[in-house]
Structures are given as C-alpha cells and as structure tokens.
C-alpha cells in the first residue's frame, strides 16, 4: 500500500466539515423563516395601533375643541339668558310700579269724581231750590207797591218835590201813607243809608206842637230822645210851624213853609208776602 493510498483513505475517513456545517445551520434557518411572518404581522399590528392611537388623539383633540366651542356657546347663551332674565325682572318690577301708580291714580280720580258728583248734586239741589224760589217770586206781588222800598214792617217812598211840609203831608195821605216816622235806631240807620248819597233834605212826619211845644209824630206819639237829637231851631215856634227834616243823616228843625223833598211811609202787607 502506497503513501498516496494512505492519504486517499485518510481523506475518505475525515468527515465533511462543510456538510456538517450546512446540517447545523439548517434548523436555525427554518426557525428564522417561521418567525418572520409573525414579526411582520406584529409590526403591522403595532403600526395599526399606532395609527389608531394617532387617529384617536386627533379625534379627541377635535372633540375637545368642539367641546370648548360648545362651552363658549353655552356660556354666551347663559349670559344672554341671564341678561334676558334680568331685563324681564326689571320689566316686571317696572310693570308692578306702573300698576301701583295707575291704581293710586285711579283711586285718586275716583275720589275726585265722587267729590265732583257730590258737588254736582249740591249744585243741582241749589238750582232746584233757586227755580222754586224764582217760581215763588214770579207769583209774589210783594208786601209793598211798585216803586216803594220795603224794610221790615214798613214801606217807604221818596216822593218828588220839593214842597212845603203841609203839601208833602197831603201827598203822602193821597198815597194812603204818612210822612216818615222813626220808631227805632234800625229804622234811622236804614233811612240814613238810603239817602247817604243824596244832597237834598227830606221832610219827616215830626213837628213842634202847641200848647206844650212838644215834638210829636203825626200819630200823636212823642219823640223818643234816645233816637236822635234835633239840630237847628229845635225850640223855636215859627208862625207857619216848626217841622223836622233829615239831611245827610242828621235831623234838623226848620220853618214848615220851606220846600223840601219828602219820605212817605206805610205799613207793609206782610200777609201778602207770605
């Protein structure tokens, strides 16, 4: 056996390292090939989850923005509603005040109307009374004749003239009267007021009589000293007589022959006045 044969045999007896190496690497290659699809799927799933998370974050951001906008709108609406409520409360308060003022005004007007109604009724009653008085006056001829003045129980007429005392007395008699007689201070005041604006003297029914030289009225009654005091020739007896006249409220004694106006007097017809 030669050396070449020994080398050839020894080379045949050595294991094939390449073959063994290939055999060792074979299982690992198969394992790697098996995990690659799973890793790919897992990566895809992670990518999908990442995309989903990103989308969710975007949607949440959008929802958050939308919620913020809605909150702003709601806040604005609340402000508007609060303003409207405040305006409504103010309007109600103003309406209540206006209603109260209107009620007070109505009550005041009603009170005034009631007073006016009472006043109107009083005026109507006064008008009715006046109409009755006018009707009564229309049927009333009066206690004194026409052109005579009525005072208490007597009628007075300021006659034309002037005439002497005697002529004046006759004129009064023709009128169914007598010359003026003063019975009281009230009568004197009435005559004084009536002739206050006259500058003429007026004969009275008072004269100085004999035998006692007393001042007597035409009906024979004496002069009452407290009524008035005679001025002038109160104690002088003239041939034609001494008579009294009134001038500007003062009574004078003078000659009966002198001319003056006169005041006639007679009783008033009080029964006819009733």
UniProtKB/Swiss-Prot annotation:
CDD domains found in the cross-reference section: CLECT_NK_receptors_like (cd03593)
GO cellular component, one term: receptor complex
Annotated disulfide bonds: 144-155, 172-264, 243-256
Main location group: membrane
Region spans: Neck: 61-150
One GO molecular-function entry: carbohydrate binding
InterPro entries per the UniProt record, alphabetical: C-type_lectin-like (IPR001304), C-type_lectin-like/link_sf (IPR016186), CTDL_fold (IPR016187), NKR-like_CTLD (IPR033992), OxLDL_rcpt1-like (IPR052332)
Cytoplasmic side: 1-37
S-palmitoyl cysteine lipid attachment residues: 46
Membrane topology term: Lipid-anchor; Single-pass type II membrane protein
Any Gene Ontology biological process: lipoprotein metabolic process
Transmembrane segments: 38-60
Protein location: Cell membrane; Membrane raft; Secreted
Positions annotated as glycosylated: 139
Region (Disordered): 1-28
Keywords per UniProt: Cell adhesion, Cell membrane, Coiled coil, Disulfide bond, Glycoprotein, Immunity, Inflammatory response, Lectin, Lipoprotein, Membrane, Palmitate, Receptor, Secreted, Signal-anchor, Transmembrane, Transmembrane helix
PTM section of the record: N-glycosylated.
Coiled coil: 89-142
Extracellular side of membrane: 61-274
Biased composition (Basic and acidic residues): 13-26
Top-rank taxon, per record: Eukaryota
Role: Receptor that mediates the recognition, internalization and degradation of oxidatively modified low density lipoprotein (oxLDL) by vascular endothelial cells. OxLDL is a marker of atherosclerosis that induces vascular endothelial cell activation and dysfunction, resulting in pro-inflammatory responses, pro-oxidative conditions and apoptosis.
Subunit structure, as described in the record: Homodimer; disulfide-linked. May form a hexamer composed of 3 homodimers. Interacts with HSP70.
Free-text domain note: The cytoplasmic region is required for subcellular sorting on the cell surface. The C-type lectin domain mediates the recognition and binding of oxLDL.
Protein name: Oxidized low-density lipoprotein receptor 1
Species in which this protein is naturally found: Sus scrofa (Pig)
Lineage: Eukaryota, Metazoa, Chordata, Craniata, Vertebrata
Gene transcribed to yield this protein: OLR1
């Amino acid at each position: 056996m030669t050396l070449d044969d020994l080398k050839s045999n020894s080379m045949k007896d050595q294991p094939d390292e390449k073959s063994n190496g290939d055999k060792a690497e074979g299982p690992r290659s198969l394992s790697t090939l098996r995990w690659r699809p799973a890793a790919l799927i897992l990566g895809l799933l992670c990518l999908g989850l990442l995309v989903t998370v990103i989308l969710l974050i975007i949607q949440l951001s959008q929802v958050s923005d939308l919620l913020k906008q809605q909150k702003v709108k709601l806040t604005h609406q609340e402000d508007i509603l609060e303003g409207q409520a405040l305006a409504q409360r103010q309007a109600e308060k103003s309406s209540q005040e206006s209603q109260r003022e209107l009620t007070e005004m109505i009550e005041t007007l009603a009170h005034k109307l009631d007073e006016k109604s009472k006043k109107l009724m009083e005026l109507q009653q006064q008008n009715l009374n006046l109409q009755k008085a006018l009707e009564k006056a229309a049927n009333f001829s009066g206690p004194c004749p026409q052109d005579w003045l009525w005072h208490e129980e007597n009628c007075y007429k300021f006659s034309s003239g002037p005439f002497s005392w005697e002529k004046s007395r006759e004129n009064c008699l023709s009128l169914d009267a007598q010359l003026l007689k003063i019975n009281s201070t009230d009568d004197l005041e009435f005559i004084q007021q009536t002739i206050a604006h006259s500058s003429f003297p007026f004969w009275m029914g008072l004269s100085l009589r004999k035998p006692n030289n007393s001042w007597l009225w035409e009906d024979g009654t004496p002069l009452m000293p407290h009524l008035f005091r005679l001025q002038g020739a109160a104690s002088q007896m003239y041939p034609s007589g001494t008579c009294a006249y009134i001038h500007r409220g003062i009574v004078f004694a003078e000659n009966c022959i002198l001319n003056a106006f006169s005041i006639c007097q007679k009783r008033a017809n009080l029964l006819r006045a009733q």
